[in-house]
């Protein structure tokens, strides 16, 4: 997905934060920041203390290097999805199934309460007994590959397509029409929403892309929320790697494709767009119908059209 900025934008800091004046020199994509150049490391953007996959993020390395190691991490993961005739490959499921205790169960005869998945409201009972941590895959969903891992209490709705490899954390929801194109890793209580396409991306816990989004080669921090129609462009028109310009200096990320990285609790408005290599710190806001410029936007930044 390619993007260029079309409208003038205004970048400002929300009043309760301060801008950092740190400077950067030119680095290669896999280099470690030098002494004092720490604003682009994972610790600036995320609290990883309770995340199940913290080893994706190397201490002291640039935050986007987690994407460099994503394929190896997921290729080496020990997947537990059973082989079962009730889970055919590459075709829509003919009937809903339940995953519980390492087994695939036909949903016929089970009682399923479709409450709020991310709050533990998906409840499956067998003759009145709750099957704790049961995951439900509805009829019409498509799984392509066995390297797919579901945590407990996950709901996959009809019409979703999940290509291996994929890891979906507990109490997450893959909604109708979602398209997971491979190497998608979602933490706990995430939403991969209706008509949302995700490719080679990382969701931390409670990250939500609920409606009509595109995420390629991107990272969502904990508690982030994408407004409907948010698009993360990940490929420049010009040849070469995505580069970041910060305080007049240029950083070569070493990546041909790099979408957006959103720090914890950052939000985007409906129909917002980010250019390749947009890095938003914690608690940022990208206003609706706004295109964010590439580069680093520090904690608490508000990005809006000048007309606002």
Predicted regions and their residues:
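Glycine- and small hydrophobic-enriched segments that form the cores of compact globular domains
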Residues: 127-205, 210
């Amino acid at each position: 997905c390619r993007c260029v900025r079309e409208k003038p934008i205004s970048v400002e800091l929300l009043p309760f934060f301060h801008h950092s004046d740190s400077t950067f020199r030119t680095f290669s994509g896999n280099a470690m920041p030098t002494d004092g150049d720490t604003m682009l490391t994972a610790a600036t953007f995320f609290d990883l203390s309770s995340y199940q996959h913290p080893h994706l993020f190397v201490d002291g390395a640039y935050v986007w290097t987690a994407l460099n190691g994503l394929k190896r991490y997921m290729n080496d993961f020990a997947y537990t999805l059973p082989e079962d005739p009730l889970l055919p490959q590459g075709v829509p499921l003919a009937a809903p199934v339940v995953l519980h205790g390492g087994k695939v169960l036909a949903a016929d005869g089970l009682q399923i309460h479709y409450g709020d998945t991310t709050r533990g409201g998906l409840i499956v009972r067998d003759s009145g007994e709750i099957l704790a941590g049961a995951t439900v895959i509805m009829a019409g969903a498509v799984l392509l590959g066995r390297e797919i891992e579901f945590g407990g209490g996950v709901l996959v709705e009809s019409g979703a397509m999940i290509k291996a490899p994929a890891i979906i954390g507990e109490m997450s929801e893959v909604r109708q029409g979602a398209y997971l194109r491979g190497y998608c890793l979602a933490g706990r209580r995430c939403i991969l929403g209706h008509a949302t396409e995700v490719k080679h991306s990382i969701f931390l816990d409670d990250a939500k892309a609920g409606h009509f989004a595109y995420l390629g080669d991107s990272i969502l921090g904990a508690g982030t929320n994408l407004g409907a129609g948010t698009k993360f462009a990940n490929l420049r028109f010009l040849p070469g790697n995505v580069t970041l310009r910060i305080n007049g200096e240029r950083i070569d990320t070493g990546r041909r494709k790099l979408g957006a990285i959103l720090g914890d609790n950052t939000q985007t408005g409906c129909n917002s767009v980010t250019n390749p290599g947009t890095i938003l710190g914690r608690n940022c806001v990208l206003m609706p119908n706004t295109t964010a410029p590439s580069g680093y936007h520090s904690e608490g930044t508000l990005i809006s059209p000048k007309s606002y």
